[in-house]
Amino acid sequence: MTNIRKTHPLLKMVNHSLIDLPAPSNISAWWNFGSLLGLCLIIQILTGLFLAMHYTSDTLTAFSSVTHICRDVNYGWLIRYLHANGASMFFVCLYMHVGRGIYYGSYTYLETWNIGIILLFAVMATAFMGYVLPWGQMSFWGATVITNLLSAIPYIGTTLVEWIWGGFSVDKATLTRFFAFHFILPFIIAALVMIHLLFLHETGSNNPSGIPSDSDKIPFHPYYTIKDILGFLLLTLLLLLLVLFSPDLLGDPDNYTPANPLNTPPHIKPEWYFLFAYAILRSIPNKLGGVLALVMSILILAIFPLLHISKQRSMMFRPISQVLFWILVADLLTLTWIGGQPVEHPFITIGQVASILYFSIILILLPLASLVENKILKW
């Protein structure tokens, strides 16, 4: 008799995507981040669900309800900090996952890549709205500054911002709708993840060499299930270290002050995972230009497949591109640092140089490097 996992309509789907899935025999730890992102999403949905049971999305009680969760709810502090730091781990995995895709040329799987970009935008939107919910100073002013950016859109900008706010400033209506969106988006993300995987399984996984691996496949289970579990353990260890030893390390002290529309904090800045984009936004001395640069800093991922002119898919055997890739990583770290600094000399100039370098590497230098490497192949 055939095994039930191969015949049962529901189990058959699970079997084809998690058990008997043919996987390349040489995928490295960089391929762990997909499953780690799945784990992060599950952690966020579960902790978020329990937080939502005790949270109130009203301007008068939001801050107090978060305090109540931390003080009076059983292990509420743990749930709250798991959720807050879980978001940080989520973005660490996200950026590693995207970086892996760029390095090994995974963006040639167009549908998978494009769904991935939509997922990135969705996760960023969710994280932004979640940051507003505790209704501290940085929540309020972050929401005010970022939503205000939409007013740079010609003609409809101001109307659009007031429509999003549900009034003439960030207030009760804004908080309530942000809570509603913050609750629903993770489930939309989960659905998009299914589509992401559906498209991935049409082609199969890429591998470090960038060479088709159809001639050398191994079953996902037990080889990669055990490898994924090791990743899960390491991620959980890191998250628990963060939550139990320094839960506020990545947060902003200003968010422990209740929101006050009459008092602007000296330095308004987003969470660390948005600082690179924030630095790019600030480095352009024009509102609309800054907003366009901000959107393009992420949307530029969509043109990677168009700029791929190398004869090799992966960067594994392309030393010039490798050097440029790691300069790009260093540049993003520089931008992240600049995003957290005040707008004054020399940070302004460093930010502008780093922003120009970011776009130059992607749009000009990497394609040029590919041309040179193609030439070298002929010698």
Curated annotation (Swiss-Prot):
Binds 2 heme b groups non-covalently. The chain crosses the membrane at residues 33-53, 77-98, 113-133, 178-198, 226-246, 288-308, 320-340, 347-367. GO terms for cellular component: mitochondrial inner membrane; respiratory chain complex III. A ubiquinone binds at residue 201. It is found in: Mitochondrion inner membrane. CDD domains: cytochrome_b_C, Cytochrome_b_N. One of its GO terms (biological process) is mitochondrial electron transport, ubiquinol to cytochrome c. InterPro entries: Cyt_b/b6_C (IPR005798), Cyt_b/b6_C_sf (IPR036150), Cyt_b/b6_N (IPR005797), Cytb/b6-like_sf (IPR027387), Cytochrome_b (IPR030689), Cytochrome_b_C_euk/bac (IPR048260), Cytochrome_b_N_euk/bac (IPR048259), Di-haem_cyt_TM (IPR016174). GO terms for molecular function: metal ion binding; ubiquinol-cytochrome-c reductase activity. SUPFAM superfamilies: a domain/subunit of cytochrome bc1 complex (Ubiquinol-cytochrome c reductase) (SSF81648), Transmembrane di-heme cytochromes (SSF81342). It holds the Pfam family Cytochrom_B_C. Its cofactor is heme b. Heme b b566 binds at residues 97, 196. Keywords: Electron transport, Heme, Iron, Membrane, Metal-binding, Mitochondrion, Mitochondrion inner membrane, Respiratory chain, Transmembrane, Transmembrane helix, Transport, Ubiquinone. It is a multi-pass membrane protein. Heme b b562 binds at residues 83, 182. Belongs to the cytochrome b family. Heme 1 (or BL or b562) is low-potential and absorbs at about 562 nm, and heme 2 (or BH or b566) is high-potential and absorbs at about 566 nm. The cytochrome bc1 complex contains 11 subunits: 3 respiratory subunits (MT-CYB, CYC1 and UQCRFS1), 2 core proteins (UQCRC1 and UQCRC2) and 6 low-molecular weight proteins (UQCRH/QCR6, UQCRB/QCR7, UQCRQ/QCR8, UQCR10/QCR9, UQCR11/QCR10 and a cleavage product of UQCRFS1). This cytochrome bc1 complex then forms a dimer. Component of the ubiquinol-cytochrome c reductase complex (complex III or cytochrome b-c1 complex) that is part of the mitochondrial respiratory chain. The b-c1 complex mediates electron transfer from ubiquinol to cytochrome c. Contributes to the generation of a proton gradient across the mitochondrial membrane that is then used for ATP synthesis. This is Cytochrome b.
